[in-house]
Amino acid sequence: MSRVAKKPVSLPKGVELNVQPELISVKGPKGTLTLQKPVGVEIAIDGDVATLSANDPSQIAITGTVRAILANMIKGVSEGFERKLELVGVGYRAAMQGKDLSLALGFSHPLVFVAPEGITLSTPTQTEILVQGADKQRVGEVAAKIRGFRPPEPYKGKGVKYAGEVIIRKEAKKA
């Protein structure tokens, strides 16, 4: 069995794990997440600990993947995930219009981004965007989509970047 799958997953208080023949659902204070259970992966719940095992040697690799996804689901419904974006550039601003995000990124028109269900967008300052949600994958997808509107360019570093992201700069062409 894979090293990841051998490690049991602990269930914090307030989190409920429900395993059905083809579906795994995790319910907690931040919402409910579901996952299609792969064939050949067994989940045993013992109190506040869940252990995974593969009943087929060909399913050993997927067992570790399911364990990692399950751990992220449990963390998501109990604590949640967030991704912070920064806007770098003159006139680059973000503002909330109700539940929609309005971005001024140097185009002739402002971009309006509608937050998908289960994702919360907020702007602590005009140059920061906070993407929050219970599903780690969807939080990352939404953050990547917003970053994709104006990715950072290597000459001046202008654009939308993740907080803490290092942009490798290039030197301008000499005449």
Curated annotation (Swiss-Prot):
What keywords tag this UniProt record? Answer: Ribonucleoprotein, Ribosomal protein, RNA-binding, rRNA-binding
- GO cellular component term of the entry, any: cytosolic large ribosomal subunit
Q: Which GO terms describe its biological process?
A: cytoplasmic translation
Q: Name one molecular function that GO assigns to this entry.
A: rRNA binding
The protein's matches in Pfam families, at most eight in alphabetical order, are given as: Ribosomal_L6 (PF00347)
PROSITE patterns named in the record: RIBOSOMAL_L6_1
The protein's matches in InterPro entries, at most eight in alphabetical order, are given as:
Ribosomal_uL6-like, Ribosomal_uL6-like_a/b-dom_sf, Ribosomal_uL6_a/b-dom, Ribosomal_uL6_bac-type, Ribosomal_uL6_CS
Tell me which family the UniProt entry assigns to this protein: Belongs to the universal ribosomal protein uL6 family.
Q: What does this protein do?
A: This protein binds to the 23S rRNA, and is important in its secondary structure. It is located near the subunit interface in the base of the L7/L12 stalk, and near the tRNA binding site of the peptidyltransferase center.
Oligomeric state and interaction partners are given as: Part of the 50S ribosomal subunit.
Query: Mind telling me what this protein is named?
Result: Large ribosomal subunit protein uL6
- Lineage, opening ranks: Bacteria, Pseudomonadati, Pseudomonadota, Gammaproteobacteria, Lysobacterales
Tell me the gene name.
rplF
